[in-house]
Amino acid sequence: SDVYKRQEHDHEGRVLTLEYPEFYLVNCYTPNSQDGLKRLDYRMTWEDAFRAYLLELDAKKPVILCGDLNVAHQEIDIKNARTNRMSAGFTDQERAKMTELLAAGFTDSFRAIHPDEVKYSWWSYRFHAREKNAGWRIDYFIVSNRIADKIKAAEIHNEVFGSDHCPVELDIDL
């Protein structure tokens, strides 16, 4: 059952859900598939259970999901697409799960506002990746389709340092 699946995954403490009168705010740190894709199978199971959870919430009221989803969804979301095809966070399987999430009734807020903009939210500490802007867009605000028209702005603040990630912002009029 879905409850069992959530209990199976809950011990890692990756999801925090806040209920507001008009919407749910879900913060998530998606499992990384790791070097050698050691956790890819677990990740696929987790993605299905998490999507089912979001759909349960969405049946009650709109959902705003934010967090490190550990996937660069499209080639525009990663600097070196060709050389990262089998890297954790850019496998066909992980990207397909993001496609499934969006197809289930959700909108990538940054892409909705900036369909062609190349901007990243994460850079490896290795190889001076941030200096070279060799990054990945793996941090998102995803919203229920029925509130997507209320998005006023969606930004990535890559001018902010202090982490291998930078802040992402959503301005939505609910």
Stretch-by-stretch model annotation:
Residues 6-8, 130-133, 158-161:
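Short Gly/Pro-enriched turn/cap motifs at secondary-structure boundaries
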Residues 25, 147-150:
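Short helix-loop capping/hinge motifs at secondary-structure junctions, enriched
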Residues 13-29:
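Beta-strand-turn-beta hairpins that frame and shape the catalytic cleft
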Residues 46-134, 138:
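Metal-dependent phosphoesterases centered on the DNase I-like endonuclease/exonuclease/phosphatase
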Residues 12-17, 137-139, 165-169:
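Short hydrophobic/aromatic beta-strand or adjacent loop that forms the aromatic wall/cage
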Residues 6, 31-47, 82-86:
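Surface-exposed cleft-lining segments at the edges of enzyme active sites
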Residues 1-4:
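Short, small-residue-biased leader/transition segments that mark boundaries at the very start
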Residues 155-174:
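Surface polyanion/phosphate-binding segment centered on an Asp-His-Pro turn
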